[in-house]
Amino acid sequence: MAAGCCGVKKQKLSSSPPSGSGGGGGASSSSHCSGESQCRAGELGLGGAGTRLNGLGGLTGGGSGSGCTLSPPQGCGGGGGGIALSPPPSCGVGTLLSTPAAATSSSPSSSSAASSSSPGSRKMVVSAEMCCFCFDVLYCHLYGYQQPRTPRFTNEPYPLFVTWKIGRDKRLRGCIGTFSAMNLHSGLREYTLTSALKDSRFPPMTRDELPRLFCSVSLLTNFEDVCDYLDWEVGVHGIRIEFINEKGSKRTATYLPEVAKEQGWDHIQTIDSLLRKGGYKAPITNEFRKTIKLTRYRSEKMTLSYAEYLAHRQHHHFQNGIGHPLPPYNHYS
């Protein structure tokens, strides 16, 4: 299911902050934004199955708080089914039932990679090739070329977010993802275009913006239901909350692992921000916070600039089946 930021029916997930804050994209899945206030990654309004998440903090299709809304993915071509979270045993921790096993992908040293998983536990799955593929897909779409063929990286199913930032200050330009586990080849292809062209907080991307873009791919892992709303670590876990608002409606919202740390928030500030993003209007009390159902998760993230993308294409031959040459970087400047 794809997710948005602030809980609405069939929302999109975006991992960025509301458009009013200069960024966007948060969903009930994950999504990373930089520490800019615009990029409060991961707010999401989870509706039902088949919803998209705007992981940067906002509903992609309306809802409260200029966030992102969750909407069913159009033409979703990935597999893997939805993520099944085991119910929290009494007061224990529920684990993600559909987490892929033993993925093997290394992250190139020339790219920026971040993972909230414990170091050395396993190889990173996210890779620079995934960001290159996203750039390939967007480039081909904007220039009318045939879409790139099947990439060479793993096609295992993961919940994922694709985030676009632009300019030297890395302003949020689009961020949408899904908490449903999708096969990476089709999932990245779909959410590359969805985040670039259909994030309701921004106009569709144009060719002129390509040279200034940064692409981030986030893969979400290790989902755990917890009993205590404080049982998560700032900078390590992303969180998804579910609560009943003052009108008796169920709402959800999410922030990616990097959001709270980038914003300088503690646990309470993060929870309260998520409640507001999820549309909760009443005064927030400690008693109400205790009624929240919280799921924590981790993520792996890779970021690549357009210039790095061209360098990888030229020097590492990440062609991904494209049958046309990319023009030199100066062509766009």
Swiss-Prot record:
Record has Phosphoprotein as a keyword: yes
UniProt-annotated location(s): Nucleus
Native organism: Homo sapiens
Lineage: Eukaryota, Metazoa, Chordata, Craniata, Vertebrata
One CC-aspect GO term: mitochondrion
Main localisation: nucleus
Keywords tagged on the record: Alport syndrome, Deafness, Disease variant, Elliptocytosis, Hereditary hemolytic anemia, Intellectual disability, Nucleus, Phosphoprotein
Protein name per Swiss-Prot or TrEMBL: Nuclear protein AMMECR1
Stretches the record annotates as Disordered: 1-39, 101-120
All copies of domain AMMECR1, residue ranges: 119-313
Residues spanning the signal sequence: none
Biased composition (Low complexity): 28-37, 101-119
Gene3D superfamilies listed in its UniProt record: Hypothetical protein ph0010, domain 1
Keyword Phosphoprotein on entry: yes
Pfam family, one: AMMECR1
Disease linked to the protein: Midface hypoplasia, hearing impairment, elliptocytosis, and nephrocalcinosis: An X-linked recessive disorder with onset in early childhood, characterized by midface hypoplasia, hearing impairment, elliptocytosis, and nephrocalcinosis. Variable clinical features include anemia, and mild early motor or speech delay. AMME complex: An X-linked contiguous gene deletion syndrome characterized by glomerulonephritis, sensorineural hearing loss, intellectual disability, midface hypoplasia and elliptocytosis.
Modified residues (Phosphoserine): 16
PANTHER family named in the record: AMMECR1 HOMOLOG, NUCLEAR PROTEIN AMMECR1
